[in-house]
Amino acid sequence: MAKYVIGPDVAIHLAHDEAVTRDDHQILAPALLRSQLLSLLYQAVHRGEMTHKDAERRLSYVRGLRIRLLGDRVLHSVAWKVADQLGWPDTFDAEYVALTQLQADALITLDR
């Protein structure tokens, strides 16, 4: 089974396209995905990029996806090391990298 870590940008994209994941793929994310997703959708509504109803629909869709959310001590420890090694100002992105290192085959992001 292929395991993929996704960030909130990809989660929103999946919801927008109403994508269906394959049975032989597992989606993973740090537990902080929920708060980041909520914040991104709120910001999009606040900027007038989507309606509150659209944001709720996307949030509901993502909640229905089979995403394994993780946030244990080992993940946090590795995220700290990743952020420190790369000189990042926080550990948010490092949690996604750490989870990929620990449990996944790839990190999927829309970042360029």
Question: Where would I find each of the regions flagged by the language model?
Answer:
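Acidic catalytic patch
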Residues: 54-87
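Short beta->alpha linker loops
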Residues: 32-33, 74, 95
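Residues in soluble alpha-helical coiled-coils and helical-bundle/repeat scaffolds
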Residues: 46-49, 70, 87, 91
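Short amphipathic alpha-helical interaction patches enriched in hydrophobic/aromatic residues
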Residues: 41, 45, 66, 83-86, ...
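Acidic, metal-associated active-site segment
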Residues: 90-106
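Short beta-strand scaffold positions
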Residues: 6, 29, 70, 91-94, ...
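Short, well-structured N-terminal submotif of metal-dependent ribonuclease cores
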Residues: 1-34, 44-57
